[in-house]
From Swiss-Prot:
Catalytic activity annotation: urea + 2 H2O + H(+) = hydrogencarbonate + 2 NH4(+)
Organism: Rhizobium leguminosarum bv. trifolii (strain WSM2304)
Subcellular location: Cytoplasm
UniProtKB keywords: Cytoplasm, Hydrolase
EC number(s) given by UniProt: 3.5.1.5
Protein's UniProt name: Urease subunit gamma
Molecular functions (GO terms): nickel cation binding; urease activity
InterPro entries linked to this entry: Urease_gamma, Urease_gamma/gamma-beta_su, Urease_gamma_sf, Urease_subunit
GO-annotated biological processes: urea catabolic process
Pathway(s) annotated for this protein in UniProt: Nitrogen metabolism; urea degradation; CO(2) and NH(3) from urea (urease route): step 1/1
């Protein structure tokens, strides 16, 4: 299978998000990369489903709560920027203060 670097990145984010979901199911708090991956995957999949940018920017801030991440992680993540493919092209989506 020949994948472009962009496709490899998307696959890696998707896999990291799957690991994060499993850890949350077990009650394990997420670390920095897991939290970023979960939020990023939410945005990428939402874009694929055709949800508008503004909706994803708002909804992305409700994917993870402070009680689901390790201490100090919420303060480390101020913005998450994801380049996602929408039906009308690729756009940069920024989720501000994603862990509340």
């Amino acid at each position: 299978m020949n994948l472009t670097p962009r496709e490899k990145d998307k696959l890696l984010i998707s896999m990291a998000a799957m690991v994060a979901r499993r850890r949350l199911e077990r009650g394990v708090k997420l670390n920095y990369p897991e939290a970023i991956a979960l939020i990023s995957d939410f945005v990428v999949e939402g874009a694929r489903d055709g949800r508008p940018v503004a909706e994803l920017m708002e909804a992305g801030a409700h994917v993870i709560g402070r009680d689901q991440v390790m201490e100090g992680i919420a303060e480390m993540i101020h913005d998450v920027q994801v380049e996602a493919t929408f039906p009308d092209g690729t756009k940069l989506v920024t989720v501000h203060e994603p862990i509340r």
